[in-house]
Amino acid sequence: MAPLRALLSYLLPLHCALCAAAGSRTPELHLSGKLSDYGVTVPCSTDFRGRFLSHVVSGPAAASAGSMVVDTPPTLPRHSSHLRVARSPLHPGGTLWPGRVGRHSLYFNVTVFGKELHLRLRPNRRLVVPGSSVEWQEDFRELFRQPLRQECVYTGGVTGMPGAAVAISNCDGLAGLIRTDSTDFFIEPLERGQQEKEASGRTHVVYRREAVQQEWAEPDGDLHNEAFGLGDLPNLLGLVGDQLGDTERKRRHAKPGSYSIEVLLVVDDSVVRFHGKEHVQNYVLTLMNIVDEIYHDESLGVHINIALVRLIMVGYRQSLSLIERGNPSRSLEQVCRWAHSQQRQDPSHAEHHDHVVFLTRQDFGPSGYAPVTGMCHPLRSCALNHEDGFSSAFVIAHETGHVLGMEHDGQGNGCADETSLGSVMAPLVQAAFHRFHWSRCSKLELSRYLPSYDCLLDDPFDPAWPQPPELPGINYSMDEQCRFDFGSGYQTCLAFRTFEPCKQLWCSHPDNPYFCKTKKGPPLDGTECAPGKWCFKGHCIWKSPEQTYGQDGGWSSWTKFGSCSRSCGGGVRSRSRSCNNPSPAYGGRLCLGPMFEYQVCNSEECPGTYEDFRAQQCAKRNSYYVHQNAKHSWVPYEPDDDAQKCELICQSADTGDVVFMNQVVHDGTRCSYRDPYSVCARGECVPVGCDKEVGSMKADDKCGVCGGDNSHCRTVKGTLGKASKQAGALKLVQIPAGARHIQIEALEKSPHRIVVKNQVTGSFILNPKGKEATSRTFTAMGLEWEDAVEDAKESLKTSGPLPEAIAILALPPTEGGPRSSLAYKYVIHEDLLPLIGSNNVLLEEMDTYEWALKSWAPCSKACGGGIQFTKYGCRRRRDHHMVQRHLCDHKKRPKPIRRRCNQHPCSQPVWVTEEWGACSRSCGKLGVQTRGIQCLLPLSNGTHKVMPAKACAGDRPEARRPCLRVPCPAQWRLGAWSQCSATCGEGIQQRQVVCRTNANSLGHCEGDRPDTVQVCSLPACGGNHQNSTVRADVWELGTPEGQWVPQSEPLHPINKISSTEPCTGDRSVFCQMEVLDRYCSIPGYHRLCCVSCIKKASGPNPGPDPGPTSLPPFSTPGSPLPGPQDPADAAEPPGKPTGSEDHQHGRATQLPGALDTSSPGTQHPFAPETPIPGASWSISPTTPGGLPWGWTQTPTPVPEDKGQPGEDLRHPGTSLPAASPVT
């Protein structure tokens, strides 16, 4: 057994196997496997006082999915990926748990790391909006939809912890956040879907936030405005800007000072598969319940509700298409675009959302990604979040904070000091801190932007809401618990037998049955431990349906008082009772009240000289207690800590060392030298009054009369001065026994030392050898003395009373030393007055008291006329010192005086507006400006007090308005010049010129349109060749709107043809087109079309030459190749660009782009169906839809040895070089 015990002493940590596939029969354990520390607990349901009711903690919502509306497209094929519709099983046994019907609050006891917490919960009725739904989608189509319910979401607090907060759901066990006064905890059931076995207890896992070993949002994991790359969205933003500026949502308005973020929650397939289809809805509701509680934290400074209006579960293929792994920017862009398409267009629709939260387990990069100040914007109010357990709630809160306008703490602001304390907006949102809070910078930034978010002013809730649910019951077996704790295959250990199977759960694997493991925790309450028995609170008890739970303990009767601890000098005796009538059982409470009761006994003084009882206990150790290899003379020492008053602590009179004797003082020992009556008993201080009654509050007056009024007290004081005539101490004065409040002090600097001697015993208690005095506190004669030395003058004080008379002596340094002078004073009862010497002055202490006006009570009203009364106190007439009121005669107390106060009229809170801020845009349709608005109450001192919005009368002034919504000015944009059209001599170059706005749309530009064509000069051509020049003309191209605008294109460079070459006929089918006759003045074109040009020069051409290469012209009505507007066009000098009037006046030219095919009536017959910028366009007489000029980047080369341009006889045509596109 020894080796076995050795092996068992090294226990393996908890290993949790997560079942990621939905519908698997393997138990799902919702432990991440990343916990550095955790605890196991079995919560129970209690009443409002914390008394045990049941181990059933789950509500019925998990067992019933409610009514479901299936809306499946009729053509959608049904396959294995379709979701099952959950049935609504009957409650087990058909009965309801007592006390659950109609309950509005729930109470649970949860043990968290050894500390039992009593949770007080109420339904969170403002998390799910009435009329909201949950949808299941696949391939961007809705499979089915059902109402979204929140019947088991609760918030609340912890009894006895004012700053605690709880956000928990009990759909399937207790799951959520418990925030205590020191740290934050998460709780969740060890295994899901086990409600039917819960009746006798269910194990839950509790872990601190800092136990989650992971990092959340990275510093660069948040998308700011300038980095929000949604591709080419300017036009789309312009469209939604119209809706944003012109559409006003008509919704129910929230209460002033309250805001609601209506959230569309989207969960992709990776989250659904991880948590399971049956559990994911309850899980995400719990997650958002925690987010809602985070935004309710008082450090935020404003009340913000998280309201779910819609839940969408996204299918597998759709999830993959929305999230691009490793690319957060692209993923967020796609999610925001898709979420915008899901928006309900009707602003009054119950599912119209303000903000989108997307949850995924796919690795898109950081833990969160969101645009800053995107709230209420149709495209930018969205956040992408990586889901990784309940800690993801803080990622969601962090990213939503960015969308609300909050920046990272410490980045550009002065809140870096709060990041280590757990601020929600820390750059690294880690779980390494105990309690979350919103930093002062987050609070300030939110207050700056919040007034401009009009969409958050809606109140989406109706007053009526469903009642909280019923609670069913569930349980587990020991083998199942072993599998939960250590993995598949583990079962109850049978290697050894134990008489207490419910003390600890031992498990082993069949592969090694003699190697047993345990978590050192008991099996769950209700686990079967023997036939007919189950485990409960670590004990194996009989099962019984009438089993009594939560049996509180009760006291037995008191025993008789025992013997007194001392025979004289004041002792104690005690009696006791037991908590066994009945004994606490089954989680019941212990008995309340003390177990022992004490009485003071034998309080008369002991005969003989006075002996300090505590000093006697220290002195007994003088003979045998060795400290540092030596024996000492021990005297009592009183510590400053009240908790150590009844411990025996002694001080060495030789060395001053203080030693704890590791035992308590004897019963009846005084607790403190400052308290003459309270005594120690069983190591605790028992308060005793001056009447010797335990627990009495009676006290002595100044001269020791119990409950007296100082009327019998006398003060004796005097001044003494004597010169020493011989060596030795000089006796100055004797103070009698019973004296109190003794003060002795030297009147001037003197080398004398004060010496105190006990007149009865003759022993010295202070400076017996005249050592140099030092300031110290010591005990003697059962009293505490304070010896102080300041500026060479010594003083001695004690509160008394003196048990025996003392003598005050002065010890000079040498014989015949200087005169010593002392002043002394003490208080004594008149019956104990000594004979008064000539140097003593007896003062009357018959202090009389009177009622005196102390102050005026606060005014009943701050303004508008109030009433206040006088407050009287008890005052001593002699020195007008205020004393306790019981010293004055209550019968003589005067009646209060009444007077009016605060007669000034009350000021009313008013709305105060700040100046309008700068416009967010200089032009366009999205310009808005905001201003701050506060409800302020003017105060009489000229300041103002911030009041809640509901305190101000009238409607809240406008905080946001449109501004500068004018069209943005357009500018000319120029392309690069093309290559020269000629290879030698003179040619032309062309560029594109377009009129565009900043949004990249067409606009109206001021001023003349820049030139699109210019002349280029190259070295002259050699030989007999003439310079080939080509001039550009204006052609028309189709725009996406179906209009035709001028477009200038240069001709293709033409190879040189010898002027001596005879004219044998036209060399291109285009020579027959009259529209090209204007180019006959160009030598190159003249050689190409010599026959047509000669005919044009000789007169009107009756028709085309029927040559073998001639083809009939194909000009048609509406052709994009119009001829010259007048004859002057043909006579224009070569090389000068020509164009239409529109072109000359700077009319905008549309770049080649997609054509609008939705209007066939405006489609040109030569316009291509799918034009591609940069591709070659060509014309064919046999192919309709071609354009006469091609766009190409490389002109077709022509062999130098042939004197004709390169043409394809099958598709005759001439190509033009393309100009560079405008950027």
Curated annotation (Swiss-Prot):
Pfam families, A to Z: ADAMTS_CR_2 (PF17771), ADAMTS_CR_3 (PF19236), ADAMTS_spacer1 (PF05986), Pep_M12B_propep (PF01562), Reprolysin (PF01421), TSP1_ADAMTS (PF19030), TSP_1 (PF00090)
Provide the GO MF annotations for this entry.
metal ion binding; metalloendopeptidase activity
Q: Which residues form the Peptidase M12B domain?
A: 259-460
- Biased-composition ranges, Basic and acidic residues, are 1199-1211
Expression sites (tissue/organ) = Expressed in retina and at low levels in brain, lung and placenta. High expression in fetal tissues.
The record places domain Disintegrin at 461-551
Q: Which intervals of the chain are annotated as region Spacer?
A: 730-846
Region of interest called Disordered, as start-end residue ranges on this chain? 1100-1223
Show the GO cellular component annotation of the record.
Answer: extracellular matrix; extracellular region
Q: What is its EC number?
A: 3.4.24.-
Fetch the InterPro entries from UniProt: ADAM_Cys-rich (IPR006586), ADAMTS/ADAMTS-like (IPR013273), ADAMTS_ADAMTS-like (IPR050439), ADAMTS_CR_2 (IPR041645), ADAMTS_CR_3 (IPR045371), ADAMTS_spacer1 (IPR010294), MetalloPept_cat_dom_sf (IPR024079), Peptidase_M12B (IPR001590)
Q: Where is the TSP type-1 domain?
A: 552-607, 847-907, 908-967, 968-1022
Q: What Gene3D superfamilies does the annotation carry?
A: 2.60.120.830, 3.40.1620.60, Collagenase (Catalytic Domain), Thrombospondin type-1 (TSP1) repeat
Q: Which GO terms describe its biological process?
A: collagen catabolic process; collagen fibril organization; extracellular matrix organization; proteolysis
Can you tell me which residues are glycosylated?
A: N109, N475, N941, N1027
The superkingdom of the source organism is Eukaryota
Q: EC class of this enzyme? A: hydrolase
Q: Which UniProt keywords apply?
A: Cleavage on pair of basic residues, Collagen degradation, Disulfide bond, Extracellular matrix, Glycoprotein, Hydrolase, Metal-binding, Metalloprotease, Protease, Repeat, Secreted, Signal, Zinc, Zymogen
Residue span(s) of the pro-peptide: 23-252
Q: Detail which positions bind Zn(2+).
A: H398, H402, H408
Subcellular location as annotated = Secreted, Extracellular space, Extracellular matrix
Q: Where is the PLAC domain?
A: 1059-1097
Function noted in UniProt: Has aminoprocollagen type I processing activity in the absence of ADAMTS2. Seems to be synthesized as a latent enzyme that requires activation to display aminoprocollagen peptidase activity. Cleaves lysyl oxidase LOX at a site downstream of its propeptide cleavage site to produce a short LOX form.
Q: What is this protein called?
A: A disintegrin and metalloproteinase with thrombospondin motifs 14
Native organism is Homo sapiens
